[in-house]
Structures are given as C-alpha cells and as structure tokens.
Swiss-Prot record:
Protein known as: Ribosome-binding factor A
GO CC annotation: cytosol
Family according to the record: Belongs to the RbfA family.
Chain segments carrying region Disordered: 115-140
Gene3D superfamilies: 3.30.300.20
Length: 140
C-alpha cells in the first residue's frame, strides 16, 4: 500500500509542477492558445511513465495546437520534473486530451433537448419535476 501512496504523491507533485511550467516555463505559443486545465495525472507503478490528461476550452483547431505544443515540450518537461522533484529518472511524459467534460456537456445538451421536445408534445408540464405516467399530484 505504501507504493500506491508514493505513486499518488508523485502524481500530485507532477500535476503541480507541470501546471506551473505551463504558465511560466513553456515558451511554445501553441500551449497558450486556449484555456488549458490538467484534469488528471496517471503515473505507472514504476514511476517511469506519466500520462497527463488535459482539457482545453476552445475550438477543435485550438485543442489540436495546444496538444501538439505540449507534446513538443514533453522532453523539456521531463527534464524539469527530474530536476524539480529530484528524481534519478523522471517519467516519460505523454499528454492526452480529456474529453470527459466535452462528453458531459453533450449529454446535458441532449437531455435538455429531450425535455424541450417532451414539453412541446405535452408529455410533461413546463417546469414540472413530475414524471409522465406518475399518479402523484403536485402539492401546493
């Protein structure tokens, strides 16, 4: 269990340091095209590989540019992580776009559209929490 805690601690430190480096250390303009957030950091048990999930607020082209810039800076980031975290061998850094927020927004949009369609058909009254077919009478 101590190994798991160490991996979690290293992942948290990597997240902190990479966030700082994204603001002040990476000079590649592609990284600064959109609003970038690190959503998760996964580190392998042997601390040799690190996958950093990022969310980029912006158009698809901006997301691609940011990801390209981050991948191009991965060698620099690896060296900085090794120096800042005083690790003999810093993990290989790979960036991956986190589409979780995008998917969540899409699902919410679909649910809202479904509710609008049901209200237009008269299946449920507007602003009602009552489900169609339920026998509950609104209180009030």
């Amino acid at each position: 269990m101590a190994q798991g805690r160490r991996v979690e601690r290293v992942a948290a430190l990597i997240r902190k340091e990479v966030s700082e480096l994204m603001i002040n250390g990476i000079r590649d303009e592609r990284v600064h095209h959109g609003m970038v957030s690190i959503t998760e950091v996964e580190v392998s048990g042997d601390l040799q590989h690190c996958k950093i999930f990022v969310s980029v607020f912006g158009e698809a082209q901006e997301r691609d540019q940011v990801l390209e810039g981050l991948q191009a800076a991965s060698g620099f980031l690896r060296g900085e992580l090794g120096r800042r975290l005083q690790m003999r061998r810093a993990p290989e850094v790979v960036f991956q776009l986190d589409r979780g927020l995008e998917r969540g927004t899409s699902v919410l949009g679909l649910l809202n559209r479904l509710e609008d369609e049901r209200q237009q058909r008269g299946d449920i009254p507007p602003g009602s929490d009552q489900q169609p077919g339920s026998d509950e009478q609104p209180t009030g």
